[in-house]
């Protein structure tokens, strides 16, 4: 089954070579680049060239790149110097997307108001919303130049105020929605209703499961997420790429923290991910 998996299913820093090889051996032919998804790391040309060689060697097609809102460099920072640095960081990932010939999107986190935020925090996040609009305005010409898209992701506990506004304000041919099933399912603030409303804007997916208690990134059909509902939504959506699964072996029964070599655990985890992911892909095709 032609489905994709994230590169950081065990760790999101250091060399991904082992994880690319194991994913390929498990039958995956597509990946989402997810290393350094929450750092200020800038990929230099020698690193991108090395990644390109690995992808060719392991017969892997890059689908999406998970961008980063950074630590100090942040595309929605209210401090202008940090925001501009965040735009440069985003451009780095956009160029990486094109250099590695990805056929998907650049996935980015927007600012979000969480259900537990007080008034002062909400005021700050709304200012961050204005910052991210300035960043998107600066990035749109590059998206046009490279014929690329940014997918804005629904985030845990977010109330959708900013995400829905951005999707309403920006053109669908450049700015879309990355649907994250695990974030949708967290019971503190489920996202089922809003996700269905914006199904026509889905251009990327992060598929994983949990029990509703937190962002566990477990294999499909191991938690409480409503996969039958999602199959129906995706059938009616604008999404056309192969399904992408964003998983974490460390939060599954396959992981043994006492082990010094996790290779066999990862092989079992990936085999299970392939079986469960393919099962859901068949549901979407039925």
For the regions a language model picked out, list residue spans one by one.
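Charged helix-capping and loop-helix junction motifs
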Residues: 44-50, 83, 87-90, 125-133, ...
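Active-site beta-loop-alpha junctions enriched in small/polar residues
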Residues: 6-10, 34-38, 67-70, 110-113, ...
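Histidine-acidic metal/acid-base catalytic patches
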Residues: 1-3, 13-27, 137, 145, ...
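Hydrophobic faces of well-ordered beta-strands that scaffold small-molecule active sites
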Residues: 3-7, 31-33, 62-67, 104-108, ...
């Amino acid at each position: 089954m032609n489905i994709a998996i994230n590169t950081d299913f065990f760790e999101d820093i250091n060399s991904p070579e082992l994880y690319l090889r194991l994913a390929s051996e498990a039958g995956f032919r597509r990946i989402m680049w997810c290393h350094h998804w929450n750092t200020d790391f800038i990929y230099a040309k020698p690193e991108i060239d090395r990644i390109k060689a690995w992808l060719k060697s392991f017969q892997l097609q890059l689908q999406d790149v998970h961008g980063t809102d950074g630590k100090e460099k942040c595309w929605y920072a209210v401090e202008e110097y940090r925001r501009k640095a965040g735009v440069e960081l985003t451009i780095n990932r956009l160029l990486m997307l094109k250099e590695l010939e990805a056929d998907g999107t650049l996935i980015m986190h927007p600012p979000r108001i969480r259900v537990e935020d007080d008034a002062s925090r909400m005021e700050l996040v709304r200012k961050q919303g204005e910052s991210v609009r300035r960043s998107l305005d600066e990035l749109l010409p590059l998206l046009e130049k490279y014929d690329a898209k940014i997918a804005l992701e629904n985030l845990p506990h977010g109330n959708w105020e900013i995400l829905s506004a951005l999707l309403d304000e920006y053109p669908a041919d450049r700015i879309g929605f990355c649907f994250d099933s695990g974030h949708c399912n967290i019971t503190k603030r489920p996202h089922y209703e809003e996700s269905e409303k914006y199904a026509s804007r889905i251009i990327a997916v992060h598929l994983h499961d949990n029990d509703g208690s937190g962002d566990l990134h477990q294999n499909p059909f191991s938690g409480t997420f409503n996969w039958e509902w999602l199959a129906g939504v995706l059938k009616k959506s604008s999404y056309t790429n192969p399904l992408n699964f964003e998983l974490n072996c460390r939060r599954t029964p396959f992981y043994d923290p006492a082990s010094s070599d996790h290779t066999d655990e990862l092989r079992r985890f990936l085999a299970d991910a392939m079986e469960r992911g393919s099962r859901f892909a068949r549901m979407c095709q039925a």
